[in-house]
């Protein structure tokens, strides 16, 4: 016997699938941006075995982005958020709680369809990652 679903329930299921697809696409985009910038192959972390990797270490599959080369380790724990309503506190908590030892938790986010991408990380992690040469420079005086 087939159970009938209400139109509202079907609509919620469809909305959930669209949201999941939207999130997956954003994760792929962020993996490509980071990979292109740092010359390393990154992929969206598989949620259900969609991406096979030789390394079976659980830490490799935390966060939304993983490195393909099992001889390397991604030192950032990246959570990607592509949502209309920002919940920064919860996102940061998720990134920090899920982050493996020795890695830096970051949240990459933007408001769906309406803003630039941003990165959020603790001040302590920021000062560790960004070298002095990118913060302080020599002033050039015109003659």
Functional labels for PLM-detected ranges:
Residues 1-143:
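Catalytic phosphate/metal-binding cores of nucleic-acid and nucleotide-processing enzymes, i.e., regions
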